Curated annotation (Swiss-Prot):
Belongs to the FPP/GGPP synthase family. Mg(2+) 1 binds at D127, D131. The gene is fps. Its EC number is 2.5.1.10, 2.5.1.1. Its cofactor is Mg(2+). This is Farnesyl diphosphate synthase. It catalyses: isopentenyl diphosphate + dimethylallyl diphosphate = (2E)-geranyl diphosphate + diphosphate; isopentenyl diphosphate + (2E)-geranyl diphosphate = (2E,6E)-farnesyl diphosphate + diphosphate. It comes from Dictyostelium discoideum (Social amoeba). Pfam families: polyprenyl_synt. It is found in: Cytoplasm. GO terms for biological process: cholesterol biosynthetic process; farnesyl diphosphate biosynthetic process; geranyl diphosphate biosynthetic process; response to xenobiotic stimulus.
Length: 382
């Protein structure tokens, strides 16, 4: 083991349960339950947060600024389902096929998992401002929360800058834990690429409804393009691709195969999300759905246009995109008349069968990587 590897092992060992006589790169971790893996994942969050915060005094940041950053990270990064973050570890476990991961590998996979969660937080803080969303994860969106310094207003547009800080944290953590890894540049590339793809997806999402009542852009082709870039890359491809890099996979066909399955899986996930935005309970999904009020190009409106009568579509043009309860309820009533719940159920079953068929044809990497991810989202909270 070279000096750089020894230094990295020593740094990681500081954050793990005491095993001072053990070589961190050779010691296998005991097999754990899903609940224990989640607990381990959550346990390192304050460690990573501290890595960010401890740099700030040396940058001459005053106490109130440090406190702001700490609260902003705690509110926005933690508290979700953490499925994206845990997918890195779960995928790596399956990719090494038959070998038990070392404690060091588990820790590093969880660091990358938290970087994915930080990326998600960066997107959501900005997205909530652009969409004028009300709640996130069962509490007011960050920009709507009380300003912790002035105490006489909300955080408001300061949250825009906070989203930038959240993005910067990702690269601080990657540099600290992965700078000496052979795949360091690849990790940086994929995070930069995924950020750009998601930002383009957000632009597509925000510019497909320029005039209320104009449904010309509300097509499934437009919808699929939005979803591919806004959701599928960062939610599905990124965590698995990070695990592949950690596993030493460099084959271009392997990454192409992963993308070929994970991007359609991301569309499947977003269609579920659109359905839940309309019919899901805020207590279950953690937010108040606003796709109708915001005139969004959602799967629901695209299917309504495809399956509705001319009279129903004309009514939708009059009432879709208006921010008041009466219009929203009328839109939902029309959705019910068109039978969107049945259309969604059929779509879900057909998409699941399609994805299973694609997964069964995979030979270049373990099929279970994709099966495990699909099992997490099929029939979720519906």
């Amino acid at each position: 083991m070279n000096n750089q590897s020894l230094q990295r092992a020593a740094m990681i060992s500081e954050h793990l349960a005491p095993t001072s006589e053990l070589n961190m790169n050779q010691t296998s971790a005991p097999i754990k339950t899903a609940k224990e893996e989640l607990a381990d994942f959550v346990e390192i969050f304050p460690i990573l947060t501290n890595e960010i915060l401890k740099e700030l005094p040396g940058m001459d940041m005053p106490p109130q600024t440090i406190a702001w950053v700490e609260k902003m990270i705690n509110v926005n990064v933690s508290g979700g389902k953490m499925n994206r973050g845990l997918t890195v570890l779960h995928s790596l476990q399956l990719l090494v096929e038959g070998r038990q991961l070392s404690r060091s590998e588990i820790f590093l996979a969880n660091v990358l998992g938290w970087c994915v969660e930080w990326l998600q937080a960066f997107f959501l803080v900005a997205d909530d401002i652009m969409d004028q969303s009300i709640t996130r994860r069962g509490q007011p969106c960050w920009y709507r929360q009380a300003n912790p310094i002035s105490n006489n207003g909300t955080i408001g547009s300061i949250a825009i800058n906070d989203s930038f800080i959240l993005e910067s944290c990702i690269y601080i953590l990657i540099k600290k834990y992965f700078r000496n890894e052979p795949y360091y540049a690849d990790i940086l590339d994929i995070f930069h690429e995924t950020s750009y793809q998601t930002e383009l997806g957000q632009l597509l999402d925000l510019t497909t409804q320029p005039n209320r009542g104009d449904f010309s852009l509300f097509t499934l082709n437009t919808y699929r393009r939005i979803v591919k870039y806004k959701t599928a890359y960062y939610s599905f491809y990124l965590p698995v691709a990070l695990a592949m890099l950690m596993a030493g996979i460099t084959s271009t066909p392997a990454f192409s195969t992963a993308k070929d399955i994970l991007l359609p899986m991301g569309e499947f996930f977003q269609v579920q999300d659109d359905f839940l935005d309309c019919y899901g309970s805020p207590a279950v999904i953690g937010k108040i759905g606003r796709d109708i009020e915001e005139n969004k190009c959602s799967w629901m409106i695209c299917q309504a246009i495809l399956n509705g009568t001319p009279e129903q579509i004309n009514l939708l043009k009059k009432h879709y995109g208006l921010d008041n309860p009466t219009d929203v309820e009328l839109v939902k009533k029309i959705y019910g008349e068109i039978g969107l719940k049945k259309i969604f159920k059929d779509y879900e079953d057909e998409s699941y069968a399609f994805l299973i068929s694609k997964i069964k044809s995979v030979r270049i990497m373990p099929q279970e990587v994709f099966i495990k991810l699909l099992s997490k989202i099929y029939k979720r909270d519906l």
